[in-house]
Swiss-Prot record:
Gene: SAM3
Annotated positions binding Mg(2+): 11
Pathway(s) it belongs to: Amino-acid biosynthesis; S-adenosyl-L-methionine biosynthesis; S-adenosyl-L-methionine from L-methionine: step 1/1
Organism per entry: Hordeum vulgare
Keyword Nucleotide-binding: yes
Protein name: S-adenosylmethionine synthase 3
EC number(s) reported in the record: 2.5.1.6
Entry's localization field: Cytoplasm
Length: 394
């Protein structure tokens, strides 16, 4: 009897999606603050709707930041250069409501900048997860990798003129047929590909479908995963001219599954963008990913999840958990011991070990097309730490 397979789906959205626009603005603000002041405390939220972008939150920094310029530059770089594409970066209203970090939080977390790195407490309570799987070279779920890469490719063909009819907003979704091999995930084929892209008035639905197949799907999805039974839904609504903030309101932190593992593993609920590294929602999730990825890359397991938890003002995590889904070469308790020996989960030390206080255009890169599985030197949490285990006991 043939082994039983199952279907699993992951989605992604483009940099022109209104929620993702907000993530990018929030991280552009963070980058600008950190570039001038590495100890900036940033909690920056962004909201957008027709003809308006607003940034709000709590920021304590020595940096001089032109928030309006950051908003307009970010929107322009995405491609929002006129009302008909969903937003005009140079004419839209920009509202700013930024205050300083609460002194109550400041004294509890970093002692008003007096605590040494190893003493810095978590910026809040919370739970964070890291996940990794051996099904792709990135050690990420294939369904998520393909959905994300389709979105990135859609933006590429828009910006380089290959498909000049494409507008900034767009969504992708990929269903993969999997085999469960004793807890490890083995992709068999791509079952369904869905792309909905904003487009201009000039293009027909037939042209859209042909261009998407030729210039987006073919370069991204390996031929071995496609067959005559693969289903394609290409702009199934039939019309997607109105998009961006004109089509939908946008808000920072509403695409947290797209940012992480596409529905695989687990998520603690905390968003990443617009948060400096004392916010463990971000730094904790980054170090948990590094731990999970290192477990897989070191051959300790084929798939695993790592959970950590924190209390506000307390440096050490309250708990660390590892589950290898039965794929571990050694017992999970042994893997957990290795993780605790090799990773420092104190927020101040995460910032140092992953170099998370460096700004520039560092974090804006994370704000579209996923925070994990990326091949970029700035994604320091993707660097594998070799975990040595006693082969004799394995």
């Amino acid at each position: 009897m043939a082994a039983e397979t199952f279907l699993f789906t992951s989605e992604s959205v483009n940099e022109g999606h209104p929620d993702k626009l907000c993530d990018q603005v929030s991280d552009a603000v963070l980058d600008a603050c950190l570039a001038q002041d590495a100890d900036s405390k940033v909690a920056c939220e962004t909201v957008t709707k027709t003809n308006m972008v607003m940034v709000l939150g709590e920021i304590t920094t020595k940096a001089t930041v032109d928030y309006e310029k950051i908003v307009r530059d970010t929107c322009r770089n995405i491609g929002f250069i006129s009302d008909d594409v969903g937003l005009d970066a140079d004419r839209c209203k920009v509202l700013v409501n930024i205050e300083q970090q609460s002194p109550d939080i400041a004294q509890g977390v970093h002692g008003h900048f007096t605590k040494r790195p190893e003493e810095v407490g978590a910026g809040d309570q919370g739970i964070m997860f890291g996940y990794a799987t051996d099904e792709t070279p990135e050690l990420m779920p294939l369904s998520h990798v393909l959905a994300t890469k389709l979105g990135a490719r859609l933006t590429e063909v828009r910006k380089n003129g290959t498909c000049a009819w494409v507008r900034p907003d767009g969504k992708t979704q990929v269903t993969v047929e999997y085999l469960n091999e004793d807890g490890a995930m083995v992709p068999v084929r791509v079952h369904t590909v869905l792309i909905s892209t904003q487009h201009d008035e000039t293009v027909t639905n037939d042209e859209i479908a042909a261009d998407l197949k030729e210039h987006v799907i073919k370069p991204v999805i390996p031929a071995k995963y496609l067959d005559e039974n693969t289903i394609f839904h290409l702009n199934p609504s039939g019309r997607f001219v109105i998009g961006g903030p004109h089509g939908d309101a946008g808000l920072t932190g509403r695409k947290i599954i797209i940012d992480t593992y596409g529905g695989w593993g687990a998520h603690g609920g905390g968003a990443f963008s617009g948060k400096d590294p004392t916010k463990v929602d971000r730094s904790g999730a980054y170090i948990a990913r590094q731990a999970a990825k290192s477990i897989i890359a070191s051959g300790l397991a084929r798939r695993c999840i790592v959970q950590i938890s924190y209390a506000i003002g307390v440096p050490e995590p309250l708990s660390v958990f590892v589950d290898s889904y039965g794929t571990g070469k050694i017992p999970d308790r042994e893997i957990l011991k290795l993780v605790k020996e090799n990773f420092d989960f104190r927020p101040g030390m995460i910032s140092i070990n992953l170099d998370l206080k460096k700004g520039g255009n560092r974090f804006i890169k994370t704000a579209a097309y996923g925070h994990f599985g990326r091949d970029d030197a700035d994604f320091t949490w993707e660097v594998v730490k070799p975990l040595k285990f006693d082969k004799a006991s394995a």
